[in-house]
């Protein structure tokens, strides 16, 4: 899949889909907003935020 720009609820929904039952760590301080909203990120990068 190509890199995507994901912000706000779209970003949270993507994490729910990717991480599933593992859950995820969503904190603006983790850099996920800079990585995935201000820039673009891959599904592989999103998976780094799963628990």
UniProtKB/Swiss-Prot annotation:
Keywords from the named record: Carbohydrate metabolism, Disulfide bond, Glucose metabolism, Hormone, Secreted
Record's subcellular location: Secreted
Family annotation (CDD domains): IlGF_insulin_like
InterPro entries (UniProt xref): Insulin, Insulin-like, Insulin-like_sf, Insulin_CS, Insulin_family
Disulphide bridges: 7-37, 19-50, 36-41
Gene Ontology cellular-component terms listed: extracellular space
Protein's UniProt keywords contain Disulfide bond: yes
MF GO annotations: hormone activity
GO annotation, biological process: glucose metabolic process
SUPFAM superfamilies referenced in this protein's UniProt entry, alphabetically: Insulin-like (SSF56994)
Pfam families, per database record: Insulin (PF00049)
Family (UniProt): Belongs to the insulin family.
Subunit structure: Heterodimer of a B chain and an A chain linked by two disulfide bonds.
Function: Insulin decreases blood glucose concentration. It increases cell permeability to monosaccharides, amino acids and fatty acids. It accelerates glycolysis, the pentose phosphate cycle, and glycogen synthesis in liver.
Annotated PANTHER family: INSULIN, INSULIN/INSULIN GROWTH FACTOR
Annotated protein name in UniProt: Insulin
Species: Crotalus atrox (Western diamondback rattlesnake)
Gene: INS
């Amino acid at each position: 899949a190509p890199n995507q720009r994901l912000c706000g609820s779209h970003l949270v929904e993507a994490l729910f889909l990717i991480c599933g039952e593992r859950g995820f760590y969503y904190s603006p301080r983790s850099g996920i907003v800079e990585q995935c909203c201000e820039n673009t990120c891959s599904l592989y990068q999103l998976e780094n935020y799963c628990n």
